[in-house]
Regions:
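N-terminal Rossmann-like NAD(P)+-binding domain of SDR-like oxidoreductases, especially those catalyzing
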Residues: 1-181
């Protein structure tokens, strides 16, 4: 997917977070120009690659998104922004729906209005709930058991619906807990 777009502009949300910052570094190393949107609520600006452009604001800010999208042509958007703590999602389910679904939807509606319709979305394997086997396959039963997973699945369903309308192309990443150190 990325080889088809080499030397292009990429818009990346959540690039000051653990996964997003690692992806940003890899994209820059591969020759991409990366613009990062991050509100820095949970991210750390020190993780952002020096060669990336960092825009600090919330992804639901249509005016600022429009300004960025009108400044250059982006080949794709990689969406890593969002809230990620399962325990917190149980205490504040509406907050997780707001950040992981509602704000993401506003962001992508704005992107699509500018013709930016290639999307890679960072979801979670938590959408499978408690699987019956250690080998989880993409086509296994979806059964989220916490508000975090439900908010991610809700946005996945939004992407699927928009693809059926012919408005976008997407890749959804459903990985398990990511851990590591820099």
């Amino acid at each position: 997917y990325f080889k088809l777009m080499s030397k292009k502009n990429i818009l990346l949300t959540g690039g000051a977070g653990y996964i997003g910052s690692h992806v940003a570094h890899k994209l820059i190393d591969a020759g991409f120009s990366v613009t990062i949107i991050d509100n820095l609520v949970t991210g750390n600006f020190k993780l952002v690659p020096k060669k990336a452009i960092l825009e600090v604001f919330d992804i639901s800010n249509k005016k600022k998104i429009s300004k960025i999208l009108s400044s250059k042509r982006f080949e794709a958007v990689l969406h890593f922004a969002g809230l990620i703590r399962v325990d917190e999602s149980v205490k504040f389910p509406k907050k997780y729906n707001l950040y992981n679904y509602e704000k993401s939807k506003i962001f992508f509606e704005t992107c699509m209005s500018y013709g930016l319709n290639k999307i890679i979305f960072s979801s979670t394997a938590s959408v499978y709930g408690k699987p019956k086997s250690l080998k989880v396959r993409e086509k296994d039963k979806i059964s989220p058991i916490n508000p975090y997973a439900k908010s991610k699945l809700r946005f996945e369903n939004y992407l699927i619906k928009e693809k059926k309308k012919g408005r976008l192309n997407y890749i959804i990443l459903r990985y398990f807990n990511v851990a590591g150190a820099d």
